[in-house]
Amino acid sequence: MKRKVMRITLLGLISIGIPLTSSWGLTTLKVGALRLSSTAPVFIGMDKGFFESEGIKLEPVWFNAAQPIAVATATGDIDVGATGLTAGLYNSIGQGMKIAVVADKGREWPGYKLTALLVSTEQWKAGVRDLKDLRGKRIGITQIGSTFHYILGNLLEQKGMSLNDVKVVPLGSISSMRDTLISNQIESVFLNQPLVAAVEKGGGGNILLWVGDHLPYQIAAIFYGEKLTKNRPAAISFMKAYIRSCRYYYDHALTKKEGASYQEILDLISKHTEEKTDAIALALPYIDRNGELLTEDTQKQLDWYFKNGMLSKKMSGNEIVDLSFWKEALQQLGK
């Protein structure tokens, strides 16, 4: 009798169009992210149903800066972080927090436009055309130990300069950096896409350089909190959906600049970032097709942060990265 009732129930659900993988049958995961073009795989996976098809109900939690996402992941307020690799994240892991960096979410890469250093219209009119021209001037970042702080320090070193040669100004959030630049309250800031294109197109600032052309760098990653690392089936399911989303982005937008699927991705990014598609199309960031992490770069980051007093102790990349989830998901999906 019980089997008959179960069979009738399942048939009834099918007949009225309710999928058997409806929300009560999914694993809910909270993912913390910024509303940036480099979050495209997350947008794609949500809107195209890749996560649901792998048994994951994804709940996005939006932030205005990267470091608070690391904190939220460490405390268990979110399950997945999708943002920049910061000193705050590394310190959390160094202090015993069980966070695992597992996949790529965006690289600074030659020929691709993710992060730019911009100068105010006043500075541009005054003739600023090189980083050396900003000696003694204010450069806005989100927070001390942020990805922007790392980028600035490395770019200055390439010019034979140091962080002591400029005035580093923590402004708290990306939106604050944008607004401060547009209003000419600061000489220079870093911004990510699609804000870079929108600011330049709107006359609010001028691009001094694209970071990827000067500093190949694993700027952002997917990382798992402790609860998710202990729930391996859910962790693998998330990763499979994420890799599928990376492939869709790579095949239909990053390496293809026309057609319905290309426009679809621009529309998805526009929907979630609230920026216009024409600005987004000007510069799509590089993300590996399989979401593969540039592991050798993490050690370089750890060494730099420690050298500059932003890490509490010297650390190894092996303490940070766990590729086992990515490798297993990739094996199940096939290349």
Language model segments and positions:
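Short, hydrophobic alpha-helical packing/hinge segments within bilobed ligand-binding/sensory domains
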Residues: P68-A70, G88-L89, S176-T180, L195-V196, ...
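Secondary-structure end/capping motifs
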Residues: K230-S312
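Conserved C-terminal helix/tail region of periplasmic/extracytoplasmic solute-binding proteins
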Residues: Q299-K335
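Short, glycine-/small- and polar/acidic-enriched structural segments
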Residues: L26-S162, V168-L171, E187-Q193, L208-W210, ...
